[in-house]
């Protein structure tokens, strides 16, 4: 069915259409050009009225409205349509843009299900269902899991727009294929995920396995406390690392340094005392986090499971050290595994993971910030560059794209973009997503919960999708405060009534 015509100036990548009805943003159309049928995506749409264009007052508006209602030619429906490629090629996974722009007057048709099904729902084990096209809900949308692991993914959205639901869905689909997922859970959003084969781990840090700088961060010694840092560095010897009573040995070593320097360097007495206070805190306040007897934290991760590394009880610095440690160990393990498999090269240790791993960093702006160098950022950057060669995929999840390191974001081969209103965030996304236009980015402010623009290598084409809801996810949703208060009030009334009866009973007894 013809729904419009190409008008004005057209380009190989974009046309303007005059339609018989308003075209919805995200709607797919067919441009029936001389070279073949071309698929287009509506990016912007405008509705105009000749009668109501230049009204000056209310009475004139009323009269003009009456004229507009009886004049079939009054309304104009104009749309900007992005050209995606020839349909027959897209159905084979090839995006071929026409060399010659569609001529003005070219017919624009409504896209049918048979035109879209093969493009957005390809066959193959690597393609998994993730939702349905927003404007064509009868069309199933699939994404390529291989591309997620080999080329990484960024999931960017405001709080409450469905980021953790999408992470849960991807994790569930990977796990259905016996894959291994690791989620760094900074806000305890995933520990109650009711999915089979889930492994929840309270992330612990073994101080013996750290270097002096990392230990200083874990103990929360300030960066500008140079003397404290120096004392810790001197005390953190190989012998201390190997001593059974780790904290006691470290404290004794600090005391020895204080005594050796108390005459010549009096500042060592105060600073050394502060280090000892930090060691005492580690033994008592942070004993459930810092455990010298956990010899291999990586050993707690199970292959073929969804592993939730709960780092919600760690401070920001401690979490940074924990994330960097796990990322480093996982990358090294995957390197050893690939080398042992393909090069027949002997390694110092037996690899723990025999197949690819997908790692998700929640609240990624905390660990890979734009303005600061952190250890987690270093290893995340290394995985973003090298992970594809060793089967280690990275998922970066954040509600503050503007605060993320742009070099790492630029290496995310795929993006899921949900509702974002900050212009700085939108600018960061525009620079990271080459295959998405500024016009389409501007529309993300109008997306609803669960809606996402999918771009990059995990989809055949940029698409606006409503993401499938994960019913097993019970945490992370907004709380219904009004209902909770109503229930609390009801129980309060019951409690008061019960108390009054007890009082009356006691009075009767007396």
Where are these regions (language model features)?
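Glycine-rich phosphate-binding loop of nucleotide-binding enzymes
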Residues: 125-205, 406, 454, 484-486, ...
